[in-house]
Amino acid sequence: MKIHGICLVKNESDILRYFLRESARWCDRIYIYDNGSTDGTWELACEIARESPRVIPFKQEGKPFRDHLRGEVFRRYRDDAVEGDWWCRLDADEVYIDDPPAFLARVPRSCHVVWSAHLQYMLTEKDLPRFRPEDEVKAPEATVETLPRHYIANASEARFFRHRNRLRWDETSWPTHMGLVSPERIRVKHLQYRSPAQIARRLSTRHTAAQRGYLHFEHETQQSWREKIADSSGLHFDAGDGRYVVDPAQLPNHLEPRWVRAMKRVMHGCGFWA
């Protein structure tokens, strides 16, 4: 079993080195599609690729952001995958807590899709004293020592799907008939807010994407990085001891309705769908 990671990235140079180092521990191939970075992300990815054979720069192209752009990577490299492999939506601001190869190995054969339990890490008022004035202009490189420590587990998204030779991925966010969702979720740290300059750049990038027609950044309408600073009293603290608080009641439901799951079992089981 191999894992193929599709990394659609834009302006993540501060965390890219850390992210690729962590992801290369378990992801067999990391395909980088740069969506028009202006902060050196693409150049850094190419530099790292010369040192790490698992990192494969696909291309840099600044077309309007859409989730279906990941399908371009899938279509380009799908022949390198075999039945039993997995594909991962591999975002540059995410680091996995659970070991993906071990986790995926125990997913029931009847299931094809794995969703995440997203631990959303925030900058809080307790982080602000460590930042210098220049950190509002240029994002410092993210390291395990400087990453935010406060989080709440309240989000969930699809992250992995099984490769099948008949899968099709056209102009959609995910492949057609991607499959049945596994009940168990894999835990991932979502390190989306890391420093004042990085937050400001993130907001600007998403404002531009929204202006160019992307409809799913409604949670990123703030104008200042200071509006993203969270109150630590409402969050859990990551003490670095490997213990995390994940309350299933705070996560959105990720499973299909029963009738949909039953239909998927029949259609995939009989081979009508890939």
Which stretches of residues belong to each language-model region?
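Hydrophobic targeting segments
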Residues: 1-7, 23, 29-33, 188
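Short, well-formed alpha-helical segments that are part of the catalytic scaffolds
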Residues: 12-28
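Short, structured coil segments at secondary-structure junctions
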Residues: 26, 48-51
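A conserved acidic beta->alpha catalytic loop
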Residues: 34-47, 62-65, 91-92
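Conserved donor nucleotide-binding strand/loop of the catalytic core
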Residues: 50-68
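Catalytic-site signature of metal-activated, phosphate-bearing donor transferases
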Residues: 68-74, 97-274
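Active-site nucleotide-sugar/metal-binding loop of Leloir-type enzymes
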Residues: 71-86
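Short beta-strand-to-loop acidic/aromatic patch adjacent to the donor-nucleotide binding site
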Residues: 83-97
